[in-house]
Each structure stands twice: as structure tokens, then as C-alpha cells.
Curated annotation (Swiss-Prot):
Physiological role: Transcriptional regulator that specifically binds 5'-GATA-3' or 5'-GAT-3' motifs within gene promoters.
Primary subcellular site in the record, as a coarse category: nucleus
Renumbered zinc finger spans (GATA-type): 1-55
The protein, known as: GATA transcription factor 26
PROSITE patterns: DEUBAD (PS51916), GATA_ZN_FINGER_1 (PS00344), GATA_ZN_FINGER_2 (PS50114)
Swiss-Prot/TrEMBL keywords: DNA-binding, Metal-binding, Nucleus, Transcription, Transcription regulation, Zinc, Zinc-finger
GO BP: regulation of DNA-templated transcription
GO terms for cellular component: nucleus
Organism of this sequence: Arabidopsis thaliana
SUPFAM superfamilies assigned to the protein according to its UniProt record, in alphabetical order: Glucocorticoid receptor-like (DNA-binding domain)
Pfam families reported in the protein's UniProt record: ASXH, GATA
């Protein structure tokens, strides 16, 4: 009696020839028996007829999966068409409402979009549920594997999109549809204009915030600003869509108006502060008279407080000897006794009102400017302090007179003396010559002489000092005005031109 199946290895019941096998599998089919005879083992071997049955089952499962996916896609398309119709209906009705109702419509539109997004998620989850529950067989669990064979009898796999990736793709498609449907609307609708209506919060449900909080709306005093705000408060959402270009122009005009007003106010404040500073520093009660200028005008403050450009501008006012060997020469200038002594002279000029425009009633503003300009431009030949001290000494002299001495009464006159000559206009020859010693800019030594000439009280004005710089050369003429007599003599000064006066730099600051 011949052998009968089934095969102990593959399980088939029909075969052309039954063959012998190993003791654990005594009966084998033709294919398995041939494998045993040639190879001597049946490990990892599956005959072709067994593989064909498995492929048929796989094809059946694959057909069921594709069927469920197609049903899910059809449901998705139907829901997307419904959602698009709802959105178009809302967009058509939206411009009819006013601004208050427009906000509510925007919230409704947002809720609709949220519902559509959630609906797409639900539909996607439903499709996934259909995909997983289409077939109850155990082999259906392979649908959730990460790889699916792309060809028969191959081990090469390709990645399968997960449910999260599918949901992301659906949301991206929905976003593109919304953007394409809103192309007809102007881009100005994204700009939320300021409104005076009371609102619970500045956030209005769009994820946007108003440009200015309506609760903190500042009442402006300018009539132009109030008129612009009233125009904006009365405008509706339909006006915003139909006249968006005009609204942008109004906003631009208002921005330029506020910008111009701010710049003008800053310039006015800066000019006013500078003018007030000049009046305060040049008045009789200037704080420069009561402080120690050595703590302000020194080398350290010059380096710290001024920029490089400002330092260069101030260095141009110095003589060449003080600007050759920097910074050593500059430090020596600040620490020199002559520079420190001139502080008291400068404070004396301020206290007597030389730089006070309001106190000098007889002097014009042009004369003050000329006085300062001449003191700065030719400070090497400046005789400001000497001339000022001489005038003050003439005022303080006993009997309002100036004592002169003859040339022979002063023995051993040094070379750098100041020669003072007086000449009468109605006489041809010189009656008398006088000399006075000026050892420093602080004081003038007067010598008693044999005769005195009477002199009226001289009026000290910036014009009298400005006349010093009007003449070129080594001598200058001082003129006296006001109560001065017409037959006043001319006072001629012959001063050396090699002296530098740092107080000219201080005048520049005023």
C-alpha cells in the first residue's frame, strides 16, 4: 500500500508522488521530499504551492484595505464640499454687519473653522477606525505595520504614512483652500483699526491684538487729533472694506503730523534750554561765580566729558605751543598758574555783567556777538582783561581821575611796560606823556604825577570793549559814550602781541 498525505512539512494533500522524509516527518510531498534528498534539511524552506496560497490570502486582505480607504476618501470629500459651502456663505454675509456685529461674525467664522478642523480630525479618525476594523481576521493587524512590501518575493520596504501625517496633510489642504477663497478680499482687513467701543479684552478671538488698547485711550487736546479719532469711531466695517485706501492715507497723515509735532517740540525745547542756559551763565548771579572753576576746567574733565570731535574743535582755538606735544602740553596748560589765575578774572567779568545781554540796556545784541567773536578770533592779540581792569580802575579812582606821570619820573622801566599817552585834539604838540606799569592782568599800578587831568565818570559798556578789537596792529582806541564829555581824550594802549588768553575759550562756551 502506497504512502498517503498530507505532507508533514507544508501540509498539502495532493502531490504527484509521495516521498520519504526524516523520522520526525516520514511522509513528504514531491517538492519537500526532493528538498530533503538533495539538501538534507527542510529548515527555512517553503514550496511554491504553499507560497501561492499565502499570496492569494494577501491579495484578498489588500483588496479589503483599499476598499476601506476609498470609502473613507469619499466621505472626506463630501465633508470638505460642505465645509467650503459654509465658508463661502459666511464670507458673503460678513460685509453687511457693522463693526460690533463684525466681531461676532468673525468669532462665528472662527468657530466654524474650528468645527471644520475638528470635523476633519473626526473624519480622519473614522477612516482610521474603518481601516482597522474592516476585517476581523488576525492577519489584518499587519495594516498598522511601519513597512509594507512593495513587490512580491522581495524584502525591500517603503515607509507608510501614519495617521498623524495624514491629519497634517489634510489640515494643510484646508489652509490652502481658505487662502485661495480669501484672495478677493483686500489685505487691509488684517489691520485692526483703533475703536472707542468698550470691549472685554483686547484679544478678539483671531489671535490678534488691537494696535492700541481702547480702555487706555488718551484724550488729546489738539483739535486735529480729536477730529481724526471721531471720524474713525463712526466708521463701520463696510467703510473699512470699501474705503480701505482712504483709511490708510488718514493713518499716514496722522503719523506724519505727530512725528512733525514731536520733532518741532524737541527742537523748541533744545533751543529754549540753550537760550536759558546762556542767560543763566551770563547773568550777574551766575553759578560760575560761586564755584571753583578748577574742579570743572581741568585735563581729566576735558578728556572724559568731550568727544574726540569736540576736543579737536577746542584744540583749534589753542596756540600752537599748547597743541604741539599732546597730551603733555595740554596737561601743562591746564595745570599752569596763568591758566588758573585767569579763572578769577573770568568770574569778575561775569559778575560785572559783561556777558549779560539783558542788563546792558545800551548795548545791542549785534555788539555783544561782535564782542565775543573778536575775543575768540584774535585771542593772541586780545587785550580784554587789561582793558577791562583799566576801565574799572578809572571808575574806582578817587575823584574820578586818572593820575599820570612824566616820562622822567619813572626810572628803570622794563621792556614789557604799557605806555599810556594822552593827547588833546585842539593842541599840536604833546603836553605830557605818561607811563604806567602793568605787571599782570590783575592789577594796574598808577604813579602819582605833578599834574592831574579831570575826567568824567566813564560808562562801561561792551561797545567800549569791542572797540579794542576794531583796530588792527599793536594799539587800540577806547571810546566812551553816554555821560562822557565830548572833549574826552583818546587813551592809546601799546600792548605786546605774544600773550595768550585762555578766557577766550571760556567765552566760546557762553
Amino acid at each position: 500500500m502506497g504512502k498517503q498525505g498530507p505532507c508533514y512539512h507544508c501540509g498539502v494533500t495532493n502531490t504527484p508522488l509521495w516521498r520519504n522524509g526524516p523520522p520526525e516527518k516520514p511522509v513528504l510531498c514531491n517538492a519537500c521530499g526532493s528538498r530533503w534528498r538533495t539538501k538534507g534539511t527542510l529548515v527555512n524552506y517553503t514550496p511554491l504551492h504553499a507560497r501561492a496560497d499565502g499570496d492569494e490570502n494577501d491579495d484578498h486582505h489588500r483588496f479589503q484595505r483599499m476598499k476601506s480607504i476609498s470609502l473613507g476618501n469619499k466621505n472626506k470629500e463630501i465633508k470638505m464640499l460642505k465645509r467650503k459651502a459654509i465658508q463661502e456663505n459666511i464670507i458673503i454675509k460678513r460685509p453687511v454687519f457693522e463693526f460690533s456685529y463684525g466681531l461676532k461674525a468673525a468669532v462665528i467664522e472662527e468657530d466654524a473653522s474650528n468645527r471644520s478642523s475638528s470635523g476633519s480630525a473626526v473624519s480622519n479618525s473614522e477612516s482610521c477606525a474603518q481601516f482597522s476594523s474592516a476585517d476581523g481576521s488576525p492577519s489584518q493587524s499587519n495594516a498598522w505595520d511601519t513597512t509594507v512590501p512593495c513587490k512580491r518575493r522581495t524584502c525591500v520596504g517603503r515607509p507608510k504614512s501614519s495617521s498623524v501625517e495624514k491629519l497634517t496633510k489634510d489640515l494643510y489642504n484646508i489652509l490652502q483652500e481658505q487662502q485661495s477663497s480669501c484672495l478677493s478680499v483686500s489685505s487691509e482687513e488684517d489691520l485692526l483699526f483703533e475703536n472707542e467701543m468698550s470691549m472685554v479684552s483686547v484679544e478678539i478671538g483671531h489671535g490678534s491684538v488691537l494696535m492700541k488698547n481702547p480702555h487706555s485711550f488718551a484724550r488729546e487736546e489738539e483739535s486735529e487729533a480729536s477730529s481724526l479719532s471721531s471720524i474713525e469711531n463712526k466708521s463701520s466695517i463696510s467703510d473699512a472694506y470699501s474705503h480701505s485706501v482712504k483709511r490708510v492715507e488718514i493713518g499716514a497723515v496722522r503719523g506724519s503730523y505727530y512725528g512733525g509735532q514731536t520733532i518741532k517740540q524737541e527742537q523748541f525745547k533744545r533751543t529754549k534750554s540753550q537760550t536759558e542756559r546762556v542767560h543763566v551763565l551770563g547773568s550777574h548771579g551766575s553759578p560760575l561765580c560761586s564755584i571753583d572753576l578748577k574742579d570743572v576746567f581741568n585735563f581729566d574733565e576735558f578728556i572724559e566729558q568731550f568727544t574726540e570731535e569736540e576736543q579737536k574743535k577746542l584744540m583749534n582755538l589753542l596756540p600752537q605751543i599748547d597743541s604741539d606735544d599732546l597730551p603733555h602740553s595740554l596737561r601743562m596748560m591746564f595745570e599752569s598758574a596763568q591758566f588758573k589765575d585767569n579763572f578769577s578774572l573770568f568770574q569778575q567779568l561775569i559778575a560785572d555783567g559783561v556777558f549779560d545781554v539783558s542788563s546792558s540796556s545800551g548795548a545791542k545784541l549785534e555788539e555783544i556777538r561782535t564782542f565775543k567773536k573778536l575775543a575768540l578770533t584774535d585771542f593772541n592779540k586780545s587785550r580784554l582783561v587789561e582793558s577791562y581792569n583799566l576801565l574799572k580802575e578809572r571808575e574806582k579812582g578817587t575823584g574820578d581821575s586818572v593820575t599820570t606821570t612824566s616820562k622822567s619820573s619813572i626810572p628803570n622801566v622794563p621792556k614789557n611796560i604799557v605806555t599810556i599817552k594822552r593827547r588833546y585834539e585842539n593842541q599840536i604838540q604833546v603836553k605830557s606823556e605818561s607811563r604806567g606799569l602793568m605787571r599782570s592782568p590783575k592789577r594796574v599800578m598808577k604813579m602819582k604825577a605833578s599834574h592831574e587831568t579831570e575826567n568824567n565818570v566813564s560808562c562801561f559798556r561792551p561797545r567800549s570793549l569791542a572797540s579794542v578789537f576794531a583796530q588792527e596792529g599793536g594799539s587800540a582806541v577806547f571810546s566812551y559814550e553816554g555821560n562822557c564829555s565830548s572833549d574826552q581824550d583818546l587813551l592809546l594802549l601799546d600792548l605786546p602781541s605774544n600773550g595768550s588768553f585762555p578766557q577766550a575759550e571760556l567765552l566760546h562756551q557762553l
